[in-house]
Swiss-Prot record:
Signal peptide: none annotated. InterPro entries: His_Pase_superF_clade-1, His_PPase_superfam, PG/BPGM_mutase_AS, Phosphogly_mut1. It comes from Clostridium acetobutylicum (strain ATCC 824 / DSM 792 / JCM 1419 / IAM 19013 / LMG 5710 / NBRC 13948 / NRRL B-527 / VKM B-1787 / 2291 / W). Belongs to the phosphoglycerate mutase family. BPG-dependent PGAM subfamily. The active site is at residues 9, 87. GO terms for molecular function: phosphoglycerate mutase activity. This is 2,3-bisphosphoglycerate-dependent phosphoglycerate mutase. Pathway: Carbohydrate degradation; glycolysis; pyruvate from D-glyceraldehyde 3-phosphate: step 3/5. Catalyzes the interconversion of 2-phosphoglycerate and 3-phosphoglycerate. It holds the Pfam family His_Phos_1. GO terms for biological process: gluconeogenesis; glycolytic process. It catalyses: (2R)-2-phosphoglycerate = (2R)-3-phosphoglycerate. The keyword Transport does not apply. Keywords: Gluconeogenesis, Glycolysis, Isomerase.
C-alpha cells in the first residue's frame, strides 16, 4: 500500500476577501499561515514522512508547503514546482468579488463558471495586465500554453500530465509524496483518481489546510481516502463516490 497526501493551501488573502483568484499570485492570510502550520503538526503527530514534494509556482501553495515541511523537520527533501499544478485560470473573473459577480450575472451563471467541467469563464484579453505572459515566472512557456481562461477539464489535462510523467512514477517507486496545490487542481486529480463522473464533481469542495490522504494499491488505484486531523482519520461521507 502507498500513501499520497493532497493538501490545499491555507486560506489566502483573496479567499478571505471572497475574490476569484486563479493564477493571481496572492499570499496566505494570517489564518492561512496558521492552517498550514496546523497541517504540518497533524502530519507529524500521525507519523507521516515524505521523500519528495510537488507544488505549483504560486506563493500560497509554495508557502503552505514550506510551513508544513518546517513543522515536520523535512525542509531538506526535494521540492518540485510546476505551473501545471497552478489553480484553474478564472479568466476575466480574477480579482472580482464572488458575491458581486453573482449579483451582476446571477447565481446559476456563476455556479456554471465555478463548478462546471466544460464551461469556461469570460477570457482575458492578452493586453490585460493579468495575462500570465506578462509574468517572468512563465517566460519559458509557449504562447499556446498560457491560458486566458480555463474550465475544470483544461485544468485536469495539465495536472494529469504532471501526474503521469512525474508524480505517479515516484509513488510506484516507493516514494512518499505530498502535493501542495489548489482547490480546482486537487478536485481535478480527485476526479481522476476516484473516476468520478463530471456531474458528480461539481459540489466537491476541498477545505483549505486539511490533509487529504489517499491509500493506493500497487497500480495506484484508491483503496480508501480520508481527511486527517489531530486524532487521526476524519471520514467524509459527502465525498463523491467513484463509478
Amino acid at each position: 500500500m502507498r500513501k499520497l497526501v493532497l493538501l490545499r493551501h491555507g486560506q489566502s488573502e483573496w479567499n478571505k476577501e471572497n475574490r476569484f483568484t486563479g493564477w493571481t499570485d496572492v499570499d496566505l492570510s494570517v489564518d492561512g499561515v496558521s492552517e498550514a502550520a496546523q497541517a504540518g503538526r497533524i502530519l507529524k503527530k500521525n507519523n507521516y514522512t515524505f521523500d519528495a514534494a510537488y507544488t505549483s509556482v504560486l506563493k500560497r501553495a509554495i508557502r503552505t508547503l514550506q510551513i508544513v515541511l518546517y513543522e515536520m523537520d523535512l525542509l531538506w527533501i526535494p521540492v518540485y514546482k510546476s505551473w501545471k499544478l497552478n489553480e484553474r485560470h478564472y479568466g476575466a473573473l480574477q480579482g472580482l468579488n464572488k458575491d458581486e459577480t453573482r449579483d451582476k450575472y446571477g447565481e446559476d451563471q456563476v455556479h456554471l463558471w465555478r463548478r462546471s467541467v466544460e464551461v469556461r469563464p469570460p477570457a482575458l484579453e492578452k493586453s490585460d495586465k493579468r495575462y500570465p505572459g506578462n509574468e517572468k515566472k512563465y517566460a519559458s512557456l509557449k504562447e499556446e500554453e498560457l491560458p486566458v481562461t480555463e474550465n475544470l477539464e483544461d485544468t485536469e489535462k495539465r495536472v494529469l500530465q504532471d501526474w503521469r510523467e512525474l508524480i505517479a512514477p515516484n509513488i510506484k517507486g516507493g516514494k512518499n509524496i505530498i502535493i501542495s496545490a489548489h482547490g480546482n487542481t486537487l478536485r481535478a486529480l480527485v476526479k481522476y483518481l476516484d473516476n468520478i463522473p463530471s456531474d458528480g464533481i461539481a459540489n466537491l469542495n476541498i477545505p483549505t489546510g486539511t490533509p487529504l490522504v489517499y491509500e493506493l494499491d500497487e497500480n495506484l488505484e484508491p483503496i480508501t481516502r480520508y481527511y486527517l486531523g489531530m486524532d487521526g482519520k476524519i471520514e467524509d461521507d459527502k465525498f463523491p463516490k467513484k463509478v
